[in-house]
């Protein structure tokens, strides 16, 4: 989740698969 792109698709910069 968030700018790091963890597995949370609702993070501001996260893809559904948790892309960075």
From Swiss-Prot:
The keyword Metal-binding does not apply. Residues 1-20 are annotated as: Disordered. It is found in: Secreted. One of its GO terms (biological process) is killing of cells of another organism. GO terms for cellular component: extracellular region. Keywords: Antimicrobial, Fungicide, Secreted. The keyword rRNA-binding does not apply. The synthetic peptide inhibits growth of fungus P.capsici and partially that of V.dahliae, F.graminearum and F.omysporum. This is Antimicrobial peptide EP-20. It comes from Xenorhabdus budapestensis.
């Amino acid at each position: 989740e968030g700018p790091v792109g963890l597995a949370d698709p609702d993070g501001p910069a996260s893809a559904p698969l948790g892309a960075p």
